[in-house]
Structure formats: C-alpha cells, structure tokens
Amino acid sequence: MLQSNEYFSGKVKSIGFTSSSTGRASVGVMAEGEYTFGTAEPEEMTVVSGALKVLLPGTVEWKVYTAGEVFNVPVHSEFHLQVAEPTSYLCRYL
C-alpha cells in the first residue's frame, strides 16, 4: 500500500511503500529550502536527481551529494539539509 506524506508546508513530499527488492522505503521530492529531519530508525538516503547539501550527526562540515550518491543517517538522530534546486530521493529504512 502507498502512503503519501507532506512536510514543511508542502515543500517536501514523499510516497512510502514496501517492496521485495527495496524493503520499506519512501521516494520523494524536496523543493528549494533548508530542512531538519529526525530519524526513528537508521536510514539510507540516495539522491535520484538534483543535489542535497547535508550536515550529518556528529560532523561539522556540510557535504554535497548528487545523483546516484548515498549517505546513511543513524537511528534517533537529526540531520540538516540545504536544497538549492528541486531534488528527488529514495529513503530506505534499515
């Protein structure tokens, strides 16, 4: 079953799903802006198109991830994003 989610007054939208190849995941799009997300479980984020500038927990330097690149976020943590152009992503819940 698909589950639609909307965050930050509609600037981030995602569709959650479960598949045999991906497991539990969501795919979505972020509009330009700055966002902070919290995690309830470990997450693997893959940039599909565009770019995300990311500040991961325990780091002090921002890093840019572009299409095809992956970063991981630990359970029970926050990560910060800066988005300069509409960017799509795949988030796998590990």
UniProtKB/Swiss-Prot annotation:
The keyword Cytoplasm does not apply. InterPro entries: Ppnp (IPR009664), RmlC-like_jellyroll (IPR014710), RmlC_Cupin_sf (IPR011051). The keyword Cell cycle does not apply. SUPFAM superfamilies: RmlC-like cupins. CDD domains: cupin_PpnP-like. GO terms for molecular function: guanosine phosphorylase activity; purine-nucleoside phosphorylase activity; thymidine phosphorylase activity; uridine phosphorylase activity. It catalyses: a purine D-ribonucleoside + phosphate = a purine nucleobase + alpha-D-ribose 1-phosphate; adenosine + phosphate = alpha-D-ribose 1-phosphate + adenine; cytidine + phosphate = cytosine + alpha-D-ribose 1-phosphate; guanosine + phosphate = alpha-D-ribose 1-phosphate + guanine. Keywords: Glycosyltransferase, Transferase. Its EC number is 2.4.2.1, 2.4.2.2. GO terms for cellular component: cytosol. Catalyzes the phosphorolysis of diverse nucleosides, yielding D-ribose 1-phosphate and the respective free bases. Can use uridine, adenosine, guanosine, cytidine, thymidine, inosine and xanthosine as substrates. Also catalyzes the reverse reactions. PANTHER family: PYRIMIDINE/PURINE NUCLEOSIDE PHOSPHORYLASE, PYRIMIDINE_PURINE NUCLEOSIDE PHOSPHORYLASE. Belongs to the nucleoside phosphorylase PpnP family. This is Pyrimidine/purine nucleoside phosphorylase. It comes from Salmonella paratyphi C (strain RKS4594).
